[in-house]
From Swiss-Prot:
Protein name: Lysine-specific demethylase JMJ27
UniProt-listed InterPro entries: JHDM2-like, JmjC_dom
Tissue: Expressed in seedlings, inflorescences, flowers and siliques, and, at low levels, in roots, leaves (including vascular bundles) and stems. Particularly observed in stomatal guard cells.
Source organism of this protein record: Arabidopsis thaliana (Mouse-ear cress)
UniProt zinc finger (RING-type) residues: 80-127
Gene name in the database record: JMJ27
Compositionally biased tracts (Polar residues): 621-631, 647-659
Induction of the gene: Negatively regulated by RPN1A via proteasome-mediated protein degradation in non-drought conditions. Accumulates in response to drought. Induced by the virulent bacterial pathogen Pseudomonas syringae pv. tomato DC3000 (Pst DC3000).
GO molecular function: histone H3K9 demethylase activity; histone H3K9me/H3K9me2 demethylase activity; zinc ion binding
Length: 840
C-alpha cells in the first residue's frame, strides 16, 4: 500500500508499469539469466538442491550414423521440461501420467531430490504442481474454492458474527449521538443526522484525523474553508472539549495518559515535518464549538470546525436495528471458558502442547491439532480457545499443499519473473536491505550473499555470529502479485479457513470491504532471517516484544540449520563470557542513573568505595521490598546484580556463571514436562506470547527495568514511549525468570517447527527468537471474538505520538465493523428468504 502522506489517500493504479530504462535493442539482446536455486543440502521446506546448467554435445558431422538399419532416423534426444536442454532419452524420465513432460536425472537430483525416479515417472513435478522451472513459476495458479456450506451452518455463522459486532456498532452510535447533542447546544436547536452535511468520498479514498492519525469511519469535524482541509475524529473532539489536551502533552503519553498531538506545519498537508501543537493557544469558543487550528499548526485559524458525516443518514442506527432482528432467534452455544477444555483433556496426547507452568491454572496447555486430522466440526474447538484469547498451534499444515518449494532462491527467481520493473540484471548484483540484529541498523547486501549466509552462516570479523533479517522482501503489498504460486500455496496451507481466508473467510471481518474500496494491508508477508540455536544474549535474531492490533497466523515454511565448526563455537563462547563480564560490571551501576553519572567524575578509589556502598544499599532494599514488589508500584527500584549478592534469589541470573550454565551448553532434548523449554531442540523459532490479562504487570516490569534493555547500536534505551508498542525490548530467559519472581506472570513459551501455523490473538504481546534460519509467512485477520479488543487497541495506539511507528490506524477497525455488519445482514436476509421459500 502506498505510504500515506497527508490525510486523503488514493491508491496507485494496480496496472501501472514503470519503465525500466532499457532500450528496445537492450531488451532483445539481454543475456539469458541463469536458472539458479540455492544449495539445498541444509535447508528444509519443500524443495532442496541446486540447479546447474548442462549442455549436451551432439555430433552432427556424420548424419548417416543417425539412421537406423530400417531406414528411419534415430531420435537425437528430448528436452527436459525444467532446464530446457536437449538431452539423450536414456538420461530422461518420462511422466506416465501426462505422457508429455520429461525431466533429466540432473534436474531431478538437484531440484527435486525429495522424490525418487519412480515417483517422478508416476507423476512428474508438473503434474504435481511443484515444478519450479521458469515457465511454471510464471503460470497463474487457480485456487480451488472451498466447498459450499450448508445453509443452516452459514446462517448460524453470520448470526454469530453479528452478535459479536453489535457492541462495537453501539459504541459508534453512542459516540455519534453525543456529538449530535453537542451540535444541538452549539446551534441552539435539536439536530438530527439529516441536518448534518454529508462529505462524499470516492471508494478508493481514506480520511484520517489530523491529530491522532486514526481512520475516520463516519462522523467527524472538518474545516469549511476551501483552502484548508483539517479533519478531526470524534475521540479528539471529546478530549478537546474536556480539556484533555491542555493538560497532557509530551512524554506523559508513555503512561497512556495522553499524547503530544502533532499536525503538519510548513508545507501544509504534504509536509513530513511535524511540530508540537500547544493547546494553550488553541481553545474552544464560548459556545463550545471548536475553532480550526492556527496557521502555524497546519490549519487556517479563522474558521470553526463543522460536523460532517460520510454515510447516509441514520445508517449506523439502521445497522443496529437490522442486526438485532437478524439475531433475534439466535442462541449462541454455551461455552465454559473458565475451566479447562474437555476435548483437550480427553485427547491430551494428540492435540495439546504444554507451553506454561503456572500454578493452579487451566491454560498451561495450548490446543495443537494436526492439520491432516482436522474436520469441519473442529472449528467449534478452535472458537473455544479463541474466545479465551489463547494461541493455537496447528501442526503439519504444509502436508495439505502441493509441495511447492519454499527455497529462498526459488522464491527470489519467481519474484523476479513477475517484476514489471525487471532490468535483467544478474542475481549477484541485486541489492536488498537487511537489519543487523547486533545494532539494529540497516545494511545493504546482495541477495546471493544474504542467502548464502542463510544456509551457511555469516560471521563478524571477530568471529561473532552475524544475524540478519531481510527487510520487506518481497514488499508486503506485492506478495500475491510477485509470488502468485507461493501465495496460493500459503493460502492452501491455512487451517480454519472460515477465519483465515483473506478473500472470502465468512468469519474474517476484514474480507467484507466493498468492491473497489481501499482495503487495509493485512498480508501475506514474508519474514526471512538467520538464526542461532542458542540464546546469545547479544545480537540474537529476534522479533522484539510487540502487540498486533489484529489477529494473526504465522506459518514456518522453510528452515536451514547452520552448522558451526567446534573452533568457531569455542570462539563464540569466549566472546560470550567477555560480554557477560562487561555487562555485569555495567549492571552494578545501572540502578540509579544520577548516582552513576556522579561516580564517573570520581577517582578509581572512590568508585570502588561507592560500588560497595551501592551493593549494600541495594541488598537491604531488596530484602525490605520483597513482599511489596508484586503489587506493581510505579517507582523504579534499584537493582544491583552481582554473583555474590543474594544467591538464594533466582530472579536475577545474569552473572557470568549463570549465563554460561544456561546459554553456553549444547541444547538437550526435553520431554516438555520440565521447565527447560529454552533447551528444546529442532524447532525453527521460539515464541513467547503473553496473556492479555498479564499486560499491566508486564508493562510495570518493563518500566522498572527499562535501563537494562538495549536497542540501536547495542546501547541502552534513551527513551521509552510505550514499552510494548515501541518494539525495542526483548526478554531473555533470565529476564523472563525475573518477571516470574517479581510479578508471578509468565508467557506461553513453545517452539515452532517446520510446517506449523501459530495463531496469535489480538492484544497478546509476543516476541520471537529464531533458532535456525527461517522463512515465515504471516497473515492478519479480524475474528468476531477479537473485534472489541481490536477497538480497544485502536484507542490505545491513537494516544501514541504522531511520529510513532504504531500510531497510524492501519486496521481501520470501525470501518471493518460497519462493513462486516452491513454485508452479513444482507446475506442473513437472503438466507432467511430462501429458507421461507423452501418451506412453502
Amino acid at each position: 500500500m502506498e505510504k500515506m502522506r497527508g490525510k486523503r489517500i488514493r491508491p496507485r493504479d494496480s496496472g501501472e508499469l514503470v519503465e525500466d530504462g532499457r532500450s528496445e535493442s537492450e531488451r532483445k539482446t539481454r543475456k539469458k539469466e541463469n536458472d539458479v536455486v540455492s544449495k539445498g543440502r541444509i535447508g528444509r521446506g519443500r524443495g532442496r538442491g541446486e540447479v546447474s546448467k548442462r549442455s549436451i554435445e551432439i555430433d552432427i558431422s556424420n548424419p548417416e550414423k543417425d539412421i537406423k538399419p530400417d531406414g528411419s532416423r534415430k531420435c537425437l534426444g528430448s528436452t527436459c521440461h525444467h532446464c530446457k536442454i536437449l538431452t539423450s532419452e536414456s538420461d530422461l524420465i518420462f511422466c506416465s501420467k501426462c505422457n508429455k513432460k520429461c525431466y533429466c536425472f540432473d534436474c531431478i537430483k538437484r531440484s527435486y531430490s525429495e522424490r525418487t525416479h519412480e515417483e517422478v515417472r508416476a507423476a512428474c513435478p508438473f503434474c504435481m504442481m511443484t515444478c519450479i522451472c521458469r515457465a511454471c513459476l510464471r503460470l497463474p495458479l487457480v485456487i480451488k474454492p472451498p466447498s459450499e456450506k450448508d445453509t443452516d451452518v452459514k446462517l448460524k455463522q453470520l448470526q454469530y458474527l453479528l452478535v459479536k459486532v453489535l457492541p462495537v456498532l453501539k459504541d459508534i452510535y453512542t459516540e455519534q449521538n453525543r456529538e449530535l447533542e453537542i451540535e444541538s447546544t452549539i446551534r441552539g436547536h435539536p439536530v438530527t443526522e439529516a441536518n448534518i452535511k454529508r462529505c462524499k468520498l470516492d471508494p478508493s479514498e481514506r480520511i484520517y484525523c489530523d491529530l491522532c492519525r486514526t481512520s475516520i469511519a463516519n462522523f467527524h469535524r472538518s474545516c469549511p474553508n476551501k483552502n484548508c482541509s483539517v479533519d478531526i475524529c470524534l475521540s479528539c473532539c471529546k478530549e478537546l472539549s474536556e480539556g484533555f489536551h491542555q493538560e497532557r502533552d509530551g512524554k506523559k503519553n508513555a503512561e497512556g495518559k495522553g499524547y503530544e498531538c502533532r499536525i503538519p506545519a510548513g508545507q501544509g498537508k504534504d509536509s513530513d515535518a511535524y511540530v508540537p501543537l500547544h493547546f494553550s493557544t488553541w481553545k474552544l469558543n464560548s459556545d463550545s464549538s471548536i475553532p480550526c487550528p492556527p496557521k502555524e499548526c497546519g490549519g487556517c485559524g479563522t474558521s470553526t470546525l463543522e460536523l460532517r458525516r460520510l454515510w447516509k443518514r441514520d445508517w449506523v442506527e439502521k445497522l443496529i436495528t437490522n442486526a438485532e432482528k437478524c439475531t433475534l432467534n439466535f442462541r449462541p452455544t454455551d461455552v465454559d471458558i473458565v475451566h479447562e477444555c474437555s476435548s483437550c483433556s480427553t485427547n491430551s496426547d494428540s492435540i495439546r502442547r504444554q507451553a506454561a507452568f503456572r500454578k493452579n491454572a487451566h491454560d498451561n496447555f495450548l490446543y495443537s491439532p494436526n492439520a491432516v486430522d482436522l474436520a469441519e466440526d473442529d472449528i467449534a474447538h478452535f472458537q473455544f480457545h479463541w474466545m479465551k484469547a489463547e494461541p493455537v498451534i496447528v501442526r503439519n499444515v504444509l502436508e495439505k499443499t502441493s509441495g511447492l518449494s519454499w527455497e529462498p532462491m526459488v522464491m527470489w527467481r519467481a519474484c523476479r519473473e513477475m517484476d514489471p520493473k525487471r532490468k535483467g540484471t544478474e542475481e549477484e548484483t541485486t541489492k536488498v536491505k537487511a537489519l543487523d540484529c547486533l545494532d539494529w541498523c540497516e545494511v545493504e547486501i546482495n541477495l546471493h550473499q544474504f542467502f548464502e549466509g542463510y544456509l551457511e552462516g555469516r560471521m563478524h570479523k571477530n568471529g561473532w555470529p552475524e544475524m540478519l533479517k531481510l527487510k520487506d522482501w518481497p514488499p508486503s503489498d506485492l506478495f500475491e502479485k510477485r509470488l502468485p504460486r507461493h501465495n496460493a500455496e500459503f493460502i492452501a496451507a491455512l487451517p480454519f479457513f472460515d477465519y483465515t481466508d483473506p478473500k472470502s473467510g465468512i468469519l474474517n471481518l476484514a474480507t467484507r470491504f466493498p468492491e473497489g474500496s481501499l482495503k487495509p494491508d493485512l498480508g501475506p508477508k514474508t519474514y526471512i532471517a538467520y538464526g542461532f540455536h542458542e540464546e546469545l544474549n547479544r545480537g540474537d535474531s529476534v522479533t522484539k516484544l510487540h502487540c498486533d492490533i489484529s489477529d494473526a497466523v504465522n506459518v514456518l515454511t522453510h528452515t536451514a540449520k547452520v552448522e558451526i565448526p567446534p573452533v568457531k563455537y569455542q570462539n563464540i563462547k569466549v566472546h560470550q563470557k567477555k560480554y557477560a563480564e562487561a555487562m555485569l560490571q555495567k549492571q552494578q551501576y545501572s540502578g540509579q542513573v544520577k548516582e552513576a553519572s556522579e561516580l564517573e567524575n570520581k577517582s578509581m578509589k572512590e568508585v570502588d568505595e561507592s560500588k560497595k556502598d551501592l551493593k549494600d544499599k541495594a541488598a537491604n532494599e531488596e530484602q525490605s521490598n520483597n513482599s511489596s514488589r508484586p503489587s506493581g508500584s510505579g517507582e523504579a527500584e534499584k537493582v544491583i546484580i552481582s554473583k555474590e549478592d543474594n544467591p538464594t534469589q533466582p530472579a536475577v541470573s545474569t552473572s557470568v556463571e549463570s549465563i554460561q550454565e544456561q546459554k553456553l551448553d549444547a541444547p538437550k532434548e526435553t520431554d516438555g514436562n520440565t521447565n527447560e523449554r529454552s533447551k528444546a531442540v529442532h524447532g525453527g523459532a521460539v515464541w513467547d506470547i503473553f496473556r492479555r490479562e498479564d499486560v499491566p504487570k508486564l508493562i510495570q516490569f518493563l518500566k522498572r527495568h527499562e535501563h537494562e534493555f538495549r536497542h540501536f547500536n547495542n546501547e541502552p534505551l534513551e527513551s521509552v514511549i510505550h514499552p510494548i508498542h515501541d518494539q525495542t525490548m526483548f526478554l531473555s530467559d533470565s529476564q523472563k525468570k525475573q518477571l516470574k519472581e517479581e510479578f508471578d506472570i509468565e508467557p506461553w513459551t513453545f517452539e515452532q517447527h517446520l510446517g506449523e501455523a501459530v495463531f496469535i490473538p489480538a492484544g497478546c504481546p509476543h516476541q520471537v527468537r529464531n533458532r535456525q534460519s527461517c522463512i515465515k509467512v504471516a497473515l492478519d485477520f479480524v475474528a468476531p471474538e477479537s473485534v472489541e479488543e481490536c477497538l480497544r487497541l485502536t484507542q490505545e495506539f491513537r494516544r501514541l505520538p504522531k511520529d510513532h511507528s504504531s500510531s497510524e490506524d492501519k486496521l481501520e477497525l470501525k470501518k471493518i465493523a460497519l462493513y462486516a455488519a452491513s454485508s452479513a445482514i444482507r446475506e442473513v436476509k437472503g438466507l432467511m428468504q430462501s429458507s421461507r421459500r423452501s418451506d412453502t
